[in-house]
Design a protein with these regions (language model features):
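Active-site-adjacent substrate/metal-binding segments within catalytic domains
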Residues: 1-57
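Hydrophobic faces of well-ordered beta-strands that scaffold small-molecule active sites
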Residues: 2-8, 43-47, 69-73, 104-108, ...
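Aromatic-rich peripheral "rim/lid" segments of glycoside hydrolase catalytic domains that contact
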Residues: 7, 18, 281-344
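Short, acidic/polar
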Residues: 16-36, 83-94, 174-182, 262-269
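Aromatic-lined substrate-binding rim segments of carbohydrate-active enzymes
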Residues: 32-88, 144-172, 296-300
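Active-site groove signature of glycoside hydrolases
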Residues: 43, 91-149, 172-178, 278-281
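A solvent-exposed, charged loop/short amphipathic helix patch at secondary-structure junctions
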Residues: 122-147, 232-255, 303-312
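Glycoside hydrolase catalytic-domain groove-lining segments
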Residues: 165, 170-250, 266-269, 273, ...
Length: 344
């Protein structure tokens, strides 16, 4: 694959109202980008988050370490107008980066049918996911103004048109496998491709089908959690966390197993190579909002997709500016695979 990538979150809203990264010191971002480039052997990073200034900060650090930037604004639960304005602000930021020589791709949203409000009924991501999975709830009234799919494509066409007036670089969208996107509006086909127990057999064919559009295909996101059985859950592995508890805890006993995650990522990277995919971004580098614990009941890293295992922050200022994580088996597995293609 030409693009060897990983996602990097700069702060995304979580269900309890906080952020996945409460602070984002520049020196810490610089350290982590260096690890991504030099140890993980990435040549690209998909930077996600809601705050444009944080995205720009991380993008600058990534560029200084020779990484291609996939700029991915994400304002979860925003309505169409709020999302539209956020994307246009991102387009202007990307053009500023492009003009100083940075390699930048603008990702105009991620799985908006469930992350943006208004297309599918529901006040939250979880509500909309539940609605999406139950066709019996889809009524004629809901489809009166067009299907969610039709309205999503109309929205994306409008956003892409306006974004091109501000940004002269390539555009894509990070689509869910259930979304039927009109890729004529984009330069790159982007898919969030999680293999699970339900799609395991047809998964290679699902990936292959995206090549029909005649554009480069990039897996914008794929990953696996860190416990026995997580490979069968794919993109829903995070649902095992009890978020009603204070602090959060695992909702049931799990057997932590880093080899499950490492094997899953290796298998999919090999599959993407064999199917001629142009690139892929492993989800994700670090997840500070899912810290580990010596008490298995509170080891949230078990339910994270992170390549590194985060430990809780200390009370001293120094701990806020240095990595509090250790490399998992998945980190080394991805580094080995990407390292094989690490050539000019």
């Amino acid at each position: 694959m030409r693009i060897r990538g990983v996602t990097y979150d700069v702060g995304t809203p979580v269900i309890n109202g906080g952020l996945t990264r409460e602070t984002l010191p520049l020196d810490l971002v610089e350290q982590e980008m260096q690890v991504i480039a030099k140890e993980l052997h990435c040549n690209a990073v998909r930077i996600t988050g809601q705050d444009i200034e944080r995205l720009k900060l991380a993008a600058g650090a990534a560029c200084r370490h020779g990484l291609e930037v996939w700029f991915s604004p994400s304002v979860h639960n925003a309505n169409e107008q709020e999302t539209f304005q956020n994307m246009l602000e991102a387009a202007s930021a990307c053009e500023d980066l492009r003009k100083v020589g940075s390699q930048v791709v603008l990702v105009l949203g991620c799985e908006l049918s469930v992350f943006m409000s208004g297309l599918i009924p529901g006040d939250s991501l979880l509500d909309r996911l539940a609605f999406l999975s139950d066709p019996s709830r889809w009524t004629a009234d809901m489809l009166a103004n067009g299907s969610p799919e039709e309205r999503l494509n109309t929205f994306l066409a409008r956003v892409a048109t306006e974004a091109r007036r501000r940004f002269a670089g390539p555009l894509t969208y990070a689509s869910g496998l259930w979304e039927d996107i009109d890729w004529r509006n984009f330069d790159i086909v982007g898919i969030d491709a999680y293999r699970d127990g339900n799609n395991r057999q047809e998964f290679p064919g699902l990936i292959r089908n995206y090549t029909q559009f005649g554009q480069p295909v990039v897996v914008t996101e794929f990953g696996c959690c860190t416990y026995v059985g997580a490979d069968d859950l794919g993109g829903m592995g995070w649902m095992v966390v009890n978020r009603q508890s204070t602090p959060w805890r695992l909702g049931k006993p799990l057997t932590r197993d880093e080899s499950v995650q490492a094997r899953y990522l290796t298998e999919l990277l090999e599959l993407f190579d064999s199917e001629g995919v142009d690139g892929a971004f492993v989800y994700t580098f670090v997840s500070p909002s899912y810290p580990s614990s010596i008490d298995p009941r509170y080891d949230l890293d078990t339910a994270s997709y992170s390549l590194v295992r985060t430990w809780p922050a200390g009370n001293d200022a120094a701990s806020q500016h240095s990595p509090r994580w250790e490399r998992k088996q998945a980190f080394h597995a991805v580094a080995r695979h990407y390292g094989k293609g690490n050539h000019p």
